[in-house]
Each structure stands twice: as structure tokens, then as C-alpha cells.
Amino acid sequence: MTTTSSIFSKFKAKKNKIKNVDLYFTPSKPIEAPTHLKGRDNEVEHILDTLTTDGKHCMIYGERGIGKSSLALSTLEGGKREGVLPSDIFVVRCDKKTKFKDIIARPAIFIDSEYAANKRETTKKAGVGLNVLKLFRTDVSAEEKIIIEKEDLTPSKACFALEELNAILLIDEFDVVSDDVKHDVAEFVKQLSDSNSPLKILLVGISSDGASLIAGHPSVNRCLHEIQLSRIEDKYLH
């Protein structure tokens, strides 16, 4: 049986053989120690393979209480630790009130250096919510700020603002959001794929099929790899 640590090392060696690139890893506080992966070697490799393939994104679904979130978090932490995944990982846990703009806000704020430097003062002045997100792109000057109205944040605008970000956005408990939000996220995934963005999306949710998690979006299937998680075999529980 492959050990928890060796599967990441094995995958790293495999990727290094395929493409000789400089991999980097910036240590930070772990999201989740990769200790929940016993018996999940195949799923871990599928996730890693998908998230390191150009234009591909990933979705984990299955019944409640089988370890979907733990698998996602532990795989991302292990992959980051070994340098096969980006060092910047954003985790959004949804609830019934979560909107598309809420999901996009975390990575958007991360790339907005001006907002990050003044977020306390800005938030205080703006009250409960900000009217705009000021997003910077590396290919435009500081004066050419892209202003995105939060109430009119479309998938195409979000993709344009974030497509150069080398990171992973984990959207957990995705099943509870509205169909409109699911459709917007699916369209966002498609546009990221079309633009060959290094920003990767990992969706996690309770479902018996992948289609319901993306509200039946017709053209996202080609770029969204589905992993249906089943209950772990008894032999791995002891």
C-alpha cells in the first residue's frame, strides 16, 4: 500500500519527468495536515493530475459524511508542501446566501495590493460592504485600474481580472448555493479554461451526480473532471 507521503513524492517525480520546470513552495500555516488520505491514493492522484493539467479543473461529489472536504484540503496541502501545486490556496465555504461575488471576493482582494494595504480603513469607511473591487492586472499600469461593480460581477469580468493568478480556489459545500450561482461558477470555470488560466477551481459538494452541482451547464464538462467519492473500504479503517 502506498504511504500518505510517498504518493505526493511519486506524483512530483512523475511531473518532473514530463516537464522540467522550476517548482516552488512557500511554507505557511497548513490548511489541513494530509492525514485523512488512507485508502484514497487513486482519488488523490486524479485530483493532482487534473489540477496540474492546462485548462482542467476538478469537482468532488458524493454523499454526506464520506470525507470530501478532508480529501480536498489534505490533497491541496500535501501538493503544496511537495511543490506540485501553487502556494496560494483560497478556501470558500458556501452557505445558502453565498453569491458569486462572495466566492470571487477572496482571490480578488488578494491580488489588489492597494485594497490589502488599506482594507481596515476602507472597510470602515464603506460600512458593511464595499461598492467596488479594485483589481490590478500585471499587464496594465497602476493608473489603469479595472473597477468591477460587485453587484454586476459577471463570470467574464471575474475571469479577466483573475486569469493570471497562479493559485487554487477551493469552493466547499457548493451544493447549497442557488442554481444561478452554480451556473455563474460553471461559466467562470469554462472561461478560465478557455483562457488557459493558471487559476484552478476545485468544487466540493453533496450530490449523486456532477451535473446537478453545475446546474446543467452544457459546455463545462470538457474542462471539469468529476470525481465521485464513495465510502472508504473497511480495510482502510483499521
Language-model segments: residues:
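A short, basic N-terminal segment
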Residues: M1-C58, E77-R81
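Surface-exposed beta-strand-to-loop junctions
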Residues: P27, V84-P86, P218-S219
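Short, solvent-exposed beta-strand edge segments and adjacent coil->beta transition regions
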Residues: E32, S87-I89, L224
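P-loop NTPase nucleotide-binding core
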Residues: D49-H183, S197-K200, G205-D209
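C-terminal alpha-helical "lid" subdomain
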Residues: T2-I7, T154-K157, E163, H238
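The catalytic "switch" region of P-loop NTPases
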Residues: S6-S9, I168, D180-H238
